[in-house]
Amino acid sequence: TIRLWPQHLKGEGHYLAVLEKEGTLRQGYCRNGEEKGIPAKDLKVPGKGIVEFLDFAKDTFDPQTLAGLEKNGTYLKFGDQLYLAPKGMPSVKGLKVLRPGLHLGTVKKNRMESSHALALALKKEQVRYTADLASDGEVIRGYLNGGTFSYEGEKGWYLIMADGFSSGWGKLAGGIMKNHYPKGLRKM
């Protein structure tokens, strides 16, 4: 501990103490703030939300990307929101945390709705399907405004890119790329 007297420095004076809690930090799978202590790499029986994410990831990501996520992080679930916390992150139990890691998505009706943050964190080689559009073209402008566009390819989730940079998600079905760009970010 140390005392910083007001007559010896500018300010009102301060008292500093370093507290150290004995014991080990536990990584954990968190559900509604309750720590379960299951690192992502050791997750044998995934909980609700993680199953949906893994199904989405198997169809969308390159296999090495999925293995890298599970190796380097811990799944955290708060309500219907799923996050990937960095490896070694201490428990957030009892804390109000805005984002405890990379937001992977939201579980809705037994399916995973992937987050925009995840799309922006990915690179072209980390996903199975991409739609790389010219940044000065009408198609990307329409996408950023919330519109759909025609696209040829296999049915599934696509990482929409503008000149090689991730922009968001799209879902191809029947030759039409459905827009999954966040409504709050769309241009008018």
Give residue ranges: language-model regions:
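A C-terminal cap/extension of S-adenosyl-L-methionine-dependent methyltransferases
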Residues: 1-11, 20-24
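Polybasic, low-complexity RNA-engagement segments
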Residues: 14, 22-188
